[in-house]
């Protein structure tokens, strides 16, 4: 992966135009000419990796509660589009398998954020194993695995020495030991929060040899500033507004 390339990641797909983390949002990215998306992955009770941000169904579907006891067959009864608008009614929660198929068909690349599974270590390890297994089916598209849970990323690296890793940080936990964390993870990227990020920090990250992909950037002015500083990518809810920055 060329760390010098300036990338715009469609955050949860084009989540300002379509329901987040749905195939409609990912397809919108392709229609707009974007080459990278960001999405979130967690796991159902039967071991199926699904694309969803929250640990409950409440915010982004017509259902409620945890999905940790559900199975793949239950997805047919869950509407992940109506909350966004009536024109999106019936949009399902996608599986990671569906996304991998879509990536192979379109050439779309993805940053996949591993969610910090709340059901315990066993399901967390199962999530990692299932995700890595699905990614073996990729035929061409690039992928980055990221997480705020750096223990999960260490588990990823222990299982796979090659998959690119991006360590996510909120500004409150971006301590001076960031380099030690990245080295222990054998990570290729650091994903810092835009708020509080300075040019000097970006210079340090880049000088250490890491890709710097910043979240979440929704104005052309901030995007241009960050790219001028040398960041390699930005995550945006409105990527279509940044294409002609």
Give residue ranges: language-model regions.
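Phosphate-group recognition and catalysis centered on beta-loop-alpha active-site segments
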Residues: 1-245
